[in-house]
Amino acid sequence: VKTTQRWTARWATLALAAAAVSAQAGTLVINTDASDPAPKAAWDAMVKGFMAANPDVTVKVNTFDHEGFKTSIRNFLTADPPDIVTWYAGNRMAPFVNANLFDDVSDVWKKEGLGDKLKSAAASMTIKGKQWGVPYTYYQWGIYYRKDIFEKNNIAVPTTWKELVAACATLKKAGVTPFAIGTKALWPTGGWFDYLNMRVNGYEFHMDLTAGKVPYTDKRVQAVFDRWDELTKPGYFLANHAGIDWQDAVPAFVKGEAAMYLMGNFAVDPMKKAGLTEDQLGFMQFPKINDVPMAEDAPTDTIHIPARAKNKADARRFLAYAASAKVQTEVNAILGQLPVNKDATKPSDTYLKDGFAMLSGAYALGQFYDRDAPAEMAKAGMEGFQRYMVKPESRKEVLERLESVRKRVYK
């Protein structure tokens, strides 16, 4: 009996070892924070499609809630890495790249021709000349405007800063607040700073600033606030914006009390539900200010291979699959967002169609101030932007405070 038990134990050990090897070779472990209904459905569809196309691979998905994922990602990348992990582009990706926790996937980009297909997101996926993941979905930011109010006041869609400021003056004179905004939650101010900085100083400067490489007291940052002054000082934003959230500013826009709204495309749904039609609601690109390439804010969700992943070969197959035009078309139809692959089928929705055209031709993509800057800097920055918008004369004091925070945060 003892001999039988010994053999049984030995065979069990061998079987477990064999299972571990086969799990490593044919199992792909994915950690994601796609816990909301639409992202979860999109990931379910993507995984199902991948397994159908690659029957030799079994995919295991671990889904975390957003906050839990953010706090545990560094731990599992170090201690028990999956084969695929979801994250974000730009400066949010940089700490993991710099800590050697993400794998260089430039080979996938080269093999699949992604430098061309994913061109708009290439800069935000590149560090030290190498690519560190694949983007699969994003959405546009821009200015939503009331076509009917523009028409009534003989305003053409502005494409330059001078034209935008002139349109604001015309609207104000007609008793219409030029811009709806609600800054109670602070982050909407980040969109304004992003666009003004990217249009005044360009994408590279904006990335350097949010990475802590430039003082907030720099004259180039002062130049951003010179432009912002042209909107804050004449009262071109809703007067009570610090006391309301972004959703609470939608009614003023719908009633025609305000004519424009700088916001992400997620705002279209509440605008339509409140009664605006496509004849009334238009979308435009944030106008040109200085002669710099036009970058856009487009928060981008990305897929990465941990540096210590066990099954990198199948992980690379998954990245190539997720980058394809067909898959990005299908996944984004579920998400109600935009495919990054420029060869994907154009969306039928008017505003997504406008966004797809704009982002496909973008020079580069910002991820939004609170993604591009570290949490402590982003919080202080957006508090400062709100204070400045309420009280433009506080500008000097605000920028000096932000500079002291920058020195502390980026030690």
PLM-predicted stretches and their roles:
Residues T170, T210-H241:
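Glycine-centered hinge/linker elements that transmit conformational signals in sensory
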Residues M93-L101, A121-V157, K184-L209, D297-P306, ...:
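Periplasmic solute-binding protein
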Residues A52-A53, T58, E151, S360-K411:
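Conserved C-terminal helix/tail region of periplasmic/extracytoplasmic solute-binding proteins
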Residues A45-K117, S124-T126, D148-T159, A259-M260, ...:
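Extracytoplasmic "Venus flytrap"/periplasmic binding protein-like
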Residues Y88-W141, V165, W192-D194, R220, ...:
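Hinge/lid segment of periplasmic solute-binding proteins
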Residues P82-D83, G113-I149, T177-A180, P293-M294, ...:
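A structural signal for short loop-to-beta-strand junctions that line the ligand-binding cleft
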Residues K117-A123, M284, N332-A380, R387, ...:
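Long, aromatic- and glycine/proline-rich binding clefts that accommodate carbohydrate-like moieties
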Residues K48, A52-A53, N153, D226, ...:
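Extracytoplasmic/periplasmic substrate-recognition and gating elements
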